[in-house]
Amino acid sequence: MSLLTEVETPIKSGWECRCNDSSDLLVAIASITGILHLILWIFDRLFFKCAYRRFRHGLKRGPSTGGIPESMREEYRQEQQSDVNVDNGHFVNIELE
């Protein structure tokens, strides 16, 4: 006999899954969990950029300005801008010995 005759070819009924050891409820729950996991993973990949950018930038908003007079708001904006402009065009040289 050759090796090719020893290989079994699956027939249509051979591909069916028969889980006699476990209950049907457990198999159904596992199947539903797997399908939900796949659906959530696909949505995560599709909307990754949109959702995570919105989440990341939403957390980086400035402090609340409710109840603060406009003059103080303007002063705060000027301080923030001056902090940004302090080092324009200046570089720090660090020499290692």
Swiss-Prot record:
Membrane topology summary: Single-pass type III membrane protein
Topological domains, Virion surface: 1-22
Residues linked to a lipid group, S-palmitoyl cysteine type: 50
Annotated site residue numbers, Essential for channel activity, possibly by being protonated during channel activation, and by forming the channel gate and the selective filter: 37
Residues passing through the membrane, by range: 23-43
Pfam family, one: Flu_M2
Alphabetized InterPro entries for the sequence: Flu_M2
Residues with the Phosphoserine modification: 64, 82
Biased composition (Basic and acidic residues): 71-80
Gene Ontology CC annotation, any one: membrane
Swiss-Prot/TrEMBL site (Seems to be involved in pH gating) positions: 41
Alphabetical UniProt keywords: Disulfide bond, Glycoprotein, Host cell membrane, Host membrane, Host-virus interaction, Hydrogen ion transport, Inhibition of host autophagy by virus, Ion channel, Ion transport, Lipoprotein, Membrane, Palmitate, Phosphoprotein, Signal-anchor, Transmembrane, Transmembrane helix, Transport, Viral ion channel, Virion
Glycosylation sites: 20
Intravirion side: 44-97
GO molecular-function terms, A-Z: monoatomic ion channel activity; proton transmembrane transporter activity
Mechanisms controlling activity: The M2 protein from most influenza A strains is inhibited by amantadine and rimantadine, resulting in viral uncoating incapacity. Emergence of amantadine-resistant variants is usually rapid.
Record GO biological process: protein complex oligomerization; symbiont genome entry into host cell via pore formation in plasma membrane; symbiont-mediated suppression of host autophagy
Domain comment, as recorded: Cytoplasmic tail plays an important role in virion assembly and morphogenesis.
Role, per record: Forms a proton-selective ion channel that is necessary for the efficient release of the viral genome during virus entry. After attaching to the cell surface, the virion enters the cell by endocytosis. Acidification of the endosome triggers M2 ion channel activity.
Family: Belongs to the influenza viruses matrix protein M2 family.
Name of the protein: Matrix protein 2
Organism name: Influenza A virus (strain A/Equine/Prague/1/1956 H7N7)
Lineage: Viruses, Riboviria, Orthornavirae, Negarnaviricota, Polyploviricotina
